[in-house]
Amino acid sequence: MTLVSFFSFLSKPLIMLLSNSSWRLSQPSFLLVGIPGLEESQHWIALPLGILYLLALVGNVTILFIIWMDPSLHQSMYLFLSMLAAIDLVLASSTAPKALAVLLVHAHEIGYIVCLIQMFFIHAFSSMESGVLVAMALDRYVAICHPLHHSTILHPGVIGRIGMVVLVRGLLLLIPFPILLGTLIFCQATIIGHAYCEHMAVVKLACSETTVNRAYGLTMALLVIGLDVLAIGVSYAHILQAVLKVPGSEARLKAFSTCGSHICVILVFYVPGIFSFLTHRFGHHVPHHVHVLLATRYLLMPPALNPLVYGVKTQQIRQRVLRVFTQKD
């Protein structure tokens, strides 16, 4: 299934739902400002964003291709990595094309339903990425703490079920976002001070009651991120405890190195995301263009950097990438 057909497959049920006659489809289109206050510099800002998007496309497609073509990589660690790469492709492609169009060719208008669909994709796949990071932490825990039972605990059937749980969780928890927004009335300006349809930026434009929208958004952020970070923390606490019992510093270092790439990916995803979330909701003295830059780059940095992290720090991936690009025939 291609990326375009995947978008179409997931979008059709949402479009049908949003097209229901009970929805306020008379709402006008939104206008995406881009980076407020930096209009004269937007072409230059688009350059690093375009580079990040290109890195995300090339890197994640390469990861998927290598894992797909090499049967020796059809193990839990690499299957979870392929899930992460697929999610990153969708996440980056949900944000970057429209953001770049706004910054480069001033295509500011975005349809009401298209805006809600983009918002759903961004938040749903961010939730899925967080879920996959939890699954990867579980994989590292089993590999280090129960190495003899790793293949029996995390066999392909279990991995498939974990992937399905991650997918369903992301869809079910985030589908209320566009549904709740569809009940709001936008009777004033519909100018979004972002380069994409950010949830709270759209909620703030409504002139009807938004308490439920705000409460649900905050609850989902705390629930998803809070529980996922807790699960990852517990996994690594057990890993640390097990590694410290390993005799010999070299053996301990080798055990830690197997977790290095995953820890880097966790930091790349959660640290900027939590910082962006906190500054957006509580950083009232932070300039708005800083909010927008943080939020936009946060959505593109993990998809761009994750393949580089795994390419550099994972020997099997690195060797196969070099083999692909150095083949004579």
Curated annotation (Swiss-Prot):
PROSITE patterns in the record: G_PROTEIN_RECEP_F1_2
Cytoplasmic side: 65-72, 139-157, 236-255, 313-329
Residue spans, topological domain Extracellular: 1-43, 94-117, 179-214, 277-291
GO terms for cellular component: plasma membrane
Carbohydrate-modified residues: N20
Cystine pairs: C115-C207
Stretches that traverse the bilayer: 44-64, 73-93, 118-138, 158-178, 215-235, 256-276, 292-312
Membrane topology, from the record: Multi-pass membrane protein
Keywords for the protein's UniProt record, in alphabetical order: Cell membrane, Disulfide bond, G-protein coupled receptor, Glycoprotein, Membrane, Olfaction, Receptor, Sensory transduction, Transducer, Transmembrane, Transmembrane helix
GO MF entry, a single one: G protein-coupled receptor activity
Pfam families associated with the record: 7tm_4
Highest taxon above the source species: Eukaryota
Compartmental location: Cell membrane
Annotated family: Belongs to the G-protein coupled receptor 1 family.
Protein name: Olfactory receptor 52L1
Species of the source: Homo sapiens
